[in-house]
Curated annotation (Swiss-Prot):
The lineage of its organism: Eukaryota, Metazoa, Chordata, Craniata, Vertebrata. Residues 1-132 form the Globin domain. SUPFAM superfamilies: Globin-like. One of its GO terms (biological process) is hydrogen peroxide catabolic process. Monomer. Belongs to the globin family. This chain appears to have diverged from the line leading to alpha-type hemoglobin chains close to the divergence of alpha and beta chains. This is Hemoglobin heart muscle subunit alpha-type. This hemoglobin may replace myocardial myoglobin in this amphibian species. One of its GO terms (molecular function) is metal ion binding. It comes from the Eukaryota. One of its GO terms (cellular component) is blood microparticle.
């Protein structure tokens, strides 16, 4: 699990992210597609052009789930059933998405991002969401 200082680092940055979850979620998906074009095939029904409503909506859903997880940093296991079936994410793809998310956070918030804490948090959320 995350240490108290890691939880604090994640929660404090989230306060700045929360008002712009759709925008930052969409940017994270755009970054994922740019870094790993092969992932576009999972979104064949989406308009994946930058800033599209599909990306804003889906990015917002992903970040909404992260926000819910952050509210329960002490009990992340309760998210196990939430997205696994709906997202059908492999752990490899979750790692790629997590890296894209951290890149976007760093681009927006620079030194305020505790990358180690966010890597650990996204890794734990990813492990929960991709376990069967």
């Amino acid at each position: 699990g995350l240490s108290d200082s890691e939880k604090s680092a994640v929660a404090s940055l989230w306060e700045k992210i929360a008002p712009q979850t759709n925008k930052l979620g969409a940017e994270s998906m755009e970054r994922l597609f740019k870094n790993h074009p092969e992932t576009k095939s999972f979104f064949s029904r989406f308009d994946i052009s930058p800033g599209s409503q599909d990306l804003l909506t889906h990015g917002g859903k992903i970040f909404g789930a992260l926000g819910e997880a952050i509210k329960s940093l002490d009990n992340l296991q309760k998210y196990q059933d939430l997205h696994t079936n709906k997202l059908k994410l492999s752990s490899d793809h979750m790692k790629l998405l997590s890296a894209a998310i951290i890149e976007v956070f760093t681009a927006h918030f620079g030194g305020e991002v505790n990358q180690a804490a966010w890597n650990k948090f996204l890794g734990e959320v990813g492990a929960i969401l991709t376990s069967s």
